[in-house]
Amino acid sequence: MKFTEKLKSLREANGFTQRQIASMLDIDVAVYNRYEKGERYMKRELIDKVAAIYHISADELNKYWLAGQVYSLLYKEENAKEVINMVAEDIVEYGINKMVEE
């Protein structure tokens, strides 16, 4: 499930309108609408707010957000699967903390 789909699924499952969620996030409803449609990327700072609205783990929601960011970088690349495998190997070999230090 993509981040955009997760946003919509959470909103609908909790019975909120886009207008209500936008108001809780203090953003324009048109901006929120674009988040759900995948026409605009949500700022990372909003992840905690969204998680709090739905009473879910920010870490879990952040995984969807990060996956969406990776997807947005690679979706047009012919060798996307190879690149993802290389990154996965680097994480296993060097550890994510080592990669962040570099």
Labelled PLM ranges:
Residues 5-24:
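Short basic helix-loop element that most often maps to the first helix and adjoining turn
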Residues 7, 21-22, 32-35, 61:
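Conserved hydrophobic/aromatic packing and binding residues within compact polymer-binding modules
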Residues 62-102:
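Short, charged recognition helix plus adjacent turn
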Residues 1, 12-13, 41:
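Short amphipathic helical patch at the helix-1/turn junction of helix-turn-helix
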Residues 25-41:
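Recognition helix of helix-turn-helix/homeodomain-like DNA-binding domains
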Residues 7, 18, 29, 44-47:
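Helix-turn-helix DNA-binding elements, focusing on the entry/boundary residues of the two helices
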Residues 45-60:
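DNA major-groove recognition helix of helix-turn-helix/homeodomain DNA-binding modules
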